[in-house]
Amino acid sequence: MKIIQIHNKYRYFGGEDSVVDEEAKLLSSNNHEVNQLIRDNSEELISFQDKFNAFKNISYSFRSVEILNKELLKFGNPDIVHVHNTFPLWTYSVFDFFKKKNIPIIMTLHNYRLIWEKLGLFNKDREKYGYFKDSNIGSFIISKFINKQKNLLKNVSKFITHTEFTKYEFSKHVIPENKLVIKPNFLNSTNNKIQSISEKNNAIFASRISKEKGILTLIKAFTKIDINLDALGDGPLFKKVKKYNINNIKLHGNLPRDKVNKFINKSKFLVFPSEWYESFPMTILEAFREGTLVLASNIGSIKSIIKDRFNGILFEPGNTSDLIDKVKWILNNQRECDQIALNANNEFNQKYSSEVNYKQLIDV
């Protein structure tokens, strides 16, 4: 089968970018011909005029249509198109383009951009997060453009969501339920030895260094906890956090995925303190695979992935005191935590391996 992947990379490499790459490898390894059409924000957003042009074309990009025409001349018409992220450079013009050619389209809903306004993503102080470059004004303008483009979604045959929670939210607000299917993210299995928490040392945070990811709540908590924290990742608050110079928190910046996995494997537990809705965090999946305990905020689809004290530990998002209490519980109940981590690893093998996911993807 010939497949075209459409994706717009993010400024900070994250889970969505990783999923796109791994999915392409999975399909190719099963003898499918995959053509990745990847655009990057660095293409255009350099000068003021470039930024203005990108903003002007945000609802329909003639540049994207030009690229697609050239690629089809080289690659030929695919059997199916799999769209991931179209924002901001591809735009929804890709749906119109392939629909006119009668080529089926599926789209993975990696985030809640289509329904941000409906969900009202707030932090613990009831301040609405600026989901576009941390700007409420920019977010408002972008949401209006997105609303204008929603009629193009009728050109999509199927939408992939990652959990029951995400399927419910999208069906409630914008997409008919019969167009939604659930397919979680996946990772390749490893033969890494699962160690007891008592044999490991530090805690780990591996995500974007930004307020919606809960980094400030995490820092407040770990200044009052006697355990070291390795913080992996980059983001808008990286320099600010670095200036705090907290003794038991070490910032490592962005690292290659293999090094991230090594950190996760040797850590007592992974902290995932996000304070807004996630879809299906890859770092949680990596911890499941490595047999490392997950301590995560009880919000959004995380509640669909983690069953408290069965395959992970949940705490109230943005609640420093609750986070501290849960860390102390982990440190004082390591034998029980070993069983929780083992349950998570068993669940990974049953639900989230590449072998299981390939069948789910083809069934879509």
Please name every model-derived segment:
Residues 308-309, 313-320, 329-334:
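Conserved acidic donor-binding segment of nucleotide-sugar-dependent glycosyltransferases
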Residues 239-261:
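Nucleotide-activated donor-binding/catalytic signature segment of Leloir-type glycosyltransferases, i.e.
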Residues 322, 329, 336-351, 357-363:
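A short, well-ordered alpha-helix in the C-terminal region of glycosyltransferases
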Residues 165, 186:
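Carbohydrate-associated surface elements
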Residues 195-213, 219-223, 230:
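Conserved donor-binding/catalytic core segment of Leloir-type glycosyltransferases
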Residues 284, 299-309, 313-314:
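Short acidic/histidine- and often glycine-rich active-site loop of Leloir-type glycosyltransferases
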Residues 293-296:
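Short hydrophobic beta-strand element within catalytic cores of glycosyltransferases
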Residues 100, 113, 125-159, 168:
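Membrane-proximal helix-turn-helix segments that form the acceptor-binding/catalytic region
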